[in-house]
Amino acid sequence: MLNLKVKMDGAVISMFKGEEGNKRILIYNPLSIFYLFLLLFLTIFLLPYLIFAGRIISYSLEIPPKAIFMIFLLSLFGSQVNLKIREARSIQPVLAFREISFFGVKWCIPEFQYGIRKTIISVNVGGALIPVLFSLFLLFYSIPALEQNLTVAYLKVFVAFIVVTLVVHKLARPIKGLGIAVPFFIPPLTAALASAVLFPIYVKTNPFIIAYVGGTLGTLVGADLLNLGKISEIGAPIVSIGGAGIFDGVYLTGITAIFILWLIV
C-alpha cells in the first residue's frame, strides 16, 4: 500500500493507494500538540453543557447518557477526518499574463484563459458520517424497540424527512470558495415543527426521534446531496459534506431540533 501526503491550503491530505490501484484519500486538518490540547480544553469547557444536554438528548431519544457522550467525543475528533467520495472537474476562467518584448522593453499583457479545476468531494466523519449512522441506529433499532405501530412511525419520519429536504433545498445556496450554505435556524426549526404536528397523529410516536432523524437526513439530502451539481460554481479545491464538524448544519440540526421541540411540545 502506498501512502502519500500532500499539503493543500493548510490541510494535510493523506493518500492511500491499494494494490489494485484504487485510491482512498483521507484529508486531515493539521494536528499538533497545541490543537489536541485545544480540543481537550474545549471538551472540558463544554462538560457542564454536555452533561445537561446529554441528559436531555438521552431522555428524549431513550439512549444511555454514556452513549450520547461517546457520540459527541467521536464527532469532535472525527471532525478532523474527511473521506473522499469522488473528484469533480469543471472548466474555470484563469487570469494569466503574457509577456511581450518590444525594443528591449518587456510588457505583461493580462488575458483570460480556461483551465480545468479539480474539486475533491468528501464526507466529514464527525459532521456527517456519525450523525447519519446514529440516525440509522434510531431508525432500525430504537423505533422497532420502542414503537408499537412501525408503519405509522416510519411514515411520520419519512414525511418529516421530505418536508425538511424540500425546505432546506429551496433555501440552500452555493457560496463561492466556501460550500453550500443555508440559514442555520431553518433546518432545526422545520424539523421541530414538522415533528410537533406529526407525532400525535393516529398513534403517538416519539417526537424527538422524528425530529432528529428527519432533520439530520433531510438537511444532508436537501443542502448537500441535491446540490452536488452546483459544485462547479463553488470553485473550491475541496468540498466536504459536514465539513464544519460539530458546528456543521447536518450535525447541529438534529440536536437543536430536540431542544426546540422541548419548548413547543
Language model features with spans:
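N-terminal amphipathic/basic-hydrophobic helices that include classical n-h-c signal peptides
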Residues: M1-M15
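Membrane-embedded alpha-helical segments in integral membrane proteins
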Residues: I44-I56, V132-S142
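C-terminal transmembrane helix-loop-helix hairpin of multi-pass membrane proteins
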Residues: F16-A53, S60-M70, V182-I186, A194-V265
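C-terminal ends of transmembrane helices
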Residues: I51-R55, Q80-R89, I109-E111, L166-G177, ...
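A glycine-rich, hydrophobic loop/mini-helix early in the fold
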Residues: R86-L136
